[in-house]
A protein has these predicted regions:
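Metal-dependent nuclease catalytic cores that hydrolyze phosphodiester bonds in DNA/RNA
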Residues: 1-127
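Short, flexible loop/turn segments with low-complexity composition
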Residues: 91, 221-222
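Mg2+/Mn2+-dependent nuclease catalytic core
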Residues: 116-220
């Protein structure tokens, strides 16, 4: 059984998928901010474009949708498991991933603050939703689960680090809680890799990317 801390008392966000991209509205207010994934996704990614060109649009779409489906189911399992629910059955194609992720959860999560955590920053004018705020070996941390078709290199996931840095900053702004580390357990058919970083190392780059987004897309935010 996982220990759960008292609720963080965060405001709820309403997700809206617009033609211009995803935004979050702060329930009970007039505030609407672009999602952090939208902000970071605005920068061109030549390696993805090259991959899509190499395999073809149809195959790229098939691979992406299959990976997204597995990722959603794996995340749902983790959420239920950390919520101390019984997992009656696990689909075979997800079980091969779950058998890698579950031991890591058991070994390192020592307390749960919140799951599916709605976060926004008035200072940065961005919003988002992270998977988990938890104690990792006793250290308050942001945790965002990822699924991949094959193992990743740190150089491939720099935007994940910026995403996690935003979550840590927004959590501090909303609650005063400091998470000095962000973890990304990335599970593939070959195992679970856990990438760890410190938000302080990515603050300047995150600000630059947000400023770049607003300079280019301010009129299309909402």
């Amino acid at each position: 059984m996982f220990h759960h801390h008292a609720a963080l008392g965060l405001p709820r966000l309403e997700q809206r998928n617009l033609a211009t991209g995803r935004v979050y509205a702060v329930v009970g207010t007039d505030l609407v901010y672009p999602s952090i994934t939208r902000v970071l996704g605005a920068k061109p990614k030549p390696h993805l474009a090259a991959w899509r060109k190499r395999v073809g649009d149809d195959e790229a779409k098939r691979i992406s949708q299959a990976a997204s489906g597995r990722g959603t189911k794996l995340h749902s399992l983790a959420e239920r498991y950390l919520g101390n629910e019984d997992l009656d059955t696990v689909e075979p194609h997800v079980m091969e991933l779950w058998r890698y992720l579950r031991p890591w959860l058991d070994a390192h999560i020592t307390g749960v603050y919140a799951q599916e955590v709605d976060l926004y920053s008035d200072k940065l004018m961005v919003a988002g939703r992270t998977d988990l705020v938890a104690d990792i070996d006793g250290v308050p941390s942001i945790v965002d689960f990822k699924q991949a078709n094959k193992p990743k290199k740190a150089s491939y996931i720099q935007d994940y680090y910026l995403q996690g840095t935003f979550y840590a900053l927004a959590l501090y702004e909303r609650t005063g809680m400091k998470c000095k580390q962000v973890l990304f357990p990335i599970t593939s058919p070959e195992g679970t890799q856990v990438f760890v970083t410190k938000p302080a190392e990515h603050y300047d780059e995150l600000l630059a990317r947000i400023e770049e987004f607003y300079a280019s897309y301010a009129e299309a935010v909402v």
